[in-house]
Design a protein with these regions (language model features):
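Short, surface-exposed "cap/lid" segments of acyl-processing enzymes
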Residues: 26-72, 236
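Short glycine-enriched, charge-decorated loop/helix-capping segments at active-site entrances
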Residues: 53-54, 83-89, 275-276
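The alpha/beta-hydrolase serine catalytic core
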Residues: 89, 134-279, 285
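Alpha/beta-hydrolase active-site loop
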Residues: 86-108, 127
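Glycine-rich "HGGG/HGxG" loop immediately N-terminal to the catalytic nucleophile
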Residues: 71-88
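N-terminal cap/lid segment of alpha/beta-hydrolase-fold proteins
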Residues: 1-35, 271
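Gly/Ala-rich beta-loop-alpha elbow adjacent to hydrolase catalytic centers
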Residues: 116-125
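Aromatic pocket-lining residues of Rossmann-like dinucleotide-binding sites
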Residues: 61, 128-129
Length: 296
């Protein structure tokens, strides 16, 4: 597909030619190879993204001079399982798929590389940039996150101020006040004050706070550029703007990462207004760090 603002071409690639993706490129070459963004699946949603958000973002970025590859990981969407990788873990297989996608982009004339994804795609993106020095930036939409002291105050505080809640507790019809109060106290004092991981992730898959911090420190040392976007779909884990920065107080994360908090938006950006917000934020971040006038 070709028009005045972008061209799109489908590719089969990978070790077994089992991966399928669509490369979107800007119409005219600039002074050098265009930067490129690899969009990574969110769960089992194929390469168009939730509510076609990846398609929208890829075309918006093409208008800013960037290439994009929307592709399916092994066994998802149009991609099949590889014939020669049956002995590796799913996590390792997905990282090899991402490596293959980045190599394809470079063969097609793409310059600086960026990875992007929503939810599990964000988590895969963070792993990919940490293990692959070819990648200069990452866009992380509703990624894994740690709760903080303030998270619990924001979460429980309004409930503790409701007269009806206290009345039920005083009349013996509810234990919720005591339970909430004990939870708040335990989380904001003593050894429980450290940031805590998302309880929905198993202990075998969730990184520790120290591991996550070490990964961020490595990326900061390399000069990587990160964009974190959190939506209202993640309020049970992320409920105020600076929670990410508060979770890592020893890091100067603000110097390397930009943060957007969209509490009105849902997790899949289902409304046009939410998609417009995300598109504008991503384009602004791209222009600042990777666009034609960005400082290298």
């Amino acid at each position: 597909m070709t028009n005045e603002t972008f061209s799109e071409r489908a590719f089969a690639f990978g070790r077994s030619q089992h991966l399928v993706g669509v490369l979107t490129k800007p119409p005219l070459a600039g002074a050098g190879p265009p930067p490129g963004i690899a969009f990574i699946n969110s769960g089992i949603i194929h390469h168009v993204g939730a509510n076609r958000i990846y398609v929208r973002l890829a075309r918006a970025l093409a208008r800013r001079g960037a290439a994009s590859l929307r592709f399916d990981l092994s066994g998802i969407g149009d991609s099949s399982q590889p014939s020669d990788q049956l002995d590796v873990s799913r996590a390792e297989l997905e990282q090899r798929d991402i490596d293959d996608a980045l190599s394809l982009m470079q063969r097609e004339g793409v310059g600086r590389l960026i990875v992007a994804g929503l939810c599990s795609g964000a988590d895969n993106s963070l792993t990919a940039i940490a293990r692959n020095e070819r990648v200069a930036g990452a866009v992380l939409l509703d990624p894994f996150v740690f709760r903080t002291r303030r998270y619990y105050v924001v979460h429980y505080g309004p409930r503790l101020l409701r007269p009806a809640v206290w009345w039920r507790a005083l009349t013996g019809r509810s234990r919720v006040v005591g339970d909430m109060a004990r939870s708040v106290v335990s989380r904001v004092s003593g050894s429980s004050a450290a940031p805590t991981a998302d309880a929905s992730l198993s202990a075998s898959t969730a990184p520790t706070h120290a591991e996550f911090q070490a990964r961020l420190e490595e990326l900061m040392a390399r000069g990587s550029r990160l964009l974190f976007v959190f939506t209202g779909g993640l309020l049970e884990r992320y409920n105020y703007r600076d929670q990410l920065f508060d979770a890592f107080p020893r890091l100067d994360l603000r110097a390397h990462a930009e943060l957007e908090f969209l509490p009105e938006a849902d997790h899949t950006f289902s409304r046009e207004a939410f998609q417009q917000q995300l598109e504008a934020r991503l384009v602004a971040w791209y222009d600042t760090h990777f666009g034609s006038t960005a400082t290298r």
